[in-house]
Regions:
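ATP/NTP phosphate-donor binding region
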Residues: 3-85, 95, 131
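ATP/nucleoside-binding phosphotransfer catalytic cores, i.e., glycine-rich phosphate-binding loops
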Residues: 16, 41, 205, 236, ...
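Catalytic core of DAGKc-family lipid kinases
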Residues: 22-24, 46, 54-55, 64, ...
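Glycine-rich beta-strand-to-loop/alpha-helix junction loops that act as flexible
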Residues: 34, 88-90, 111-113
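Short glycine/serine/threonine-rich phosphate/pyrophosphate-binding segments
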Residues: 92-97, 118
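Short hydrophobic-aromatic micro-motifs
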Residues: 152-161, 165, 211-212, 216-220, ...
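Gly/Ser/Thr-rich active-site loops/lids in small-molecule metabolic enzymes
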Residues: 174-183, 219, 225-254
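A generic structural signal for short beta-strands and their flanking turns/coil linkers
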Residues: 197-199, 213-215, 238-243, 277-281
Length: 319
């Protein structure tokens, strides 16, 4: 079983501008998810230790177990009220730490060592661990929005339907067949698209009710580009609104057609594509519980689902 760990670094305090010179050194916990991506935990730890030292930072390793414990470690780290808490991992790890940090004065530092690293990419944080470590000591703090569904935070997106089914099947393939995350996701996508089903939902958007039968509902923390070669990216994370996307199309051919609309920059012109920008969304279903994927992590949640945006509730160090 891979191990994960917490590092402690000595860095300067964080402000909503350029970081000051480290005149008063503080201990800052850095959470490392040794299971992110396809790397091995021990090798990854050694690489990160070297990257931190090249950045002039002094790490100390605190081992911890996998899963939800990352939130407990983050809470314990916050007891000392550090100015910066650094998370090294994928979007799931960052999301868990952000869930603890939101609404506090502690800033999130990001070392993106996961598989997709969407949050880091959208904020312009280097994907190289050494360069990202430099940012932690020399960058600036900004405030970004955090999404929430039934009290659970997400920094990128939350979705139900097709993608949640894909995550469930991906996790099963990783567990049973020991496939890599990327390979398992590809096989899961092929399986789900071949058997896609609709969800009977009642959406309350901006005080209006929308009855729909949809293969998915995608809720983004801010607006996602849905067209062309920048599809799936965000130009800002402080717009103060959730962006909700869904379609009435179902079946593999219908979804492929939707994807082609996106590729040619015509997604918003597709007849069955729907989008709303709102601070709050309520999703009702005949089902007592629904599977919801939040930043790639699967959760079974009681209905109705209450989605909210928490504007500028998270401080993050960026270049």
């Amino acid at each position: 079983m891979r191990r994960a760990a917490v590092w402690v670094l000595h860095v300067g305090s964080c402000m909503d501008a350029s970081l000051p010179e480290p005149l008063r050194l503080k201990e800052v916990p850095v959470i490392l998810n040794g299971g992110s991506g396809d790397g091995h935990g021990d090798e990854e730890a050694k690489r990160l230790e070297e990257a931190f030292r090249k950045a002039g930072l002094e790490p100390r390793l605190w081992p911890f177990g996998p899963g939800e414990e990352v939130r407990e470690v983050a809470r314990r780290a916050l007891e000392a009220r550090p100015p910066v808490l650094v998370a090294a991992g994928g979007d799931g790890t960052l999301s868990a730490v952000a869930d603890v940090l939101r609404g506090t004065d502690t800033a999130l530092g990001v070392i993106p060592v996961g598989t997709m690293n969407h949050f880091a990419k959208d904020l312009g944080i280097p994907l190289d661990a050494g360069e990202a470590a430099q940012v932690i000591g020399t960058g600036r703090c900004i405030r970004v929005d955090v999404g929430e569904v039934n009290g659970r935070a997400f920094i990128n997106n939350a979705s139900l339907g097709i993608y949640a089914d894909m995550v469930r099947k991906r996790e099963r393939q990783q567990r049973r067949l020991r496939r890599s995350k990327r390979s398992a996701m590809l096989w899961a996508a092929l399986e789900v698209l071949g058997r896609s089903r609709r969800l009977d939902l009642r959406l309350e958007v901006d005080g209006r009710v929308q009855e729909c039968r949809a293969p998915f509902v995608f809720v983004g923390n801010n607006d996602y580009a849905m067209e062309g070669f920048v599809i799936g990216t965000r130009s800002r994370l402080d717009g103060g609104l959730l962006n909700v996307y869904t379609t009435r199309r179902c079946g593999a051919l219908g979804l492929i057609g939707l994807a082609l609309h996106a590729l040619f920059g015509r997604l918003r012109q597709a007849d069955d594509f729907m989008q709303w920008s709102v601070p709050h969304l309520r999703v009702e279903s005949p089902r007592r519980r629904l599977l919801v994927a939040t930043d790639g992590e699967l959760n079974s949640m009681e209905t109705p689902l209450e989605f909210r945006i928490r504007p500028r509730s998270l401080r993050v160090i960026v270049p």
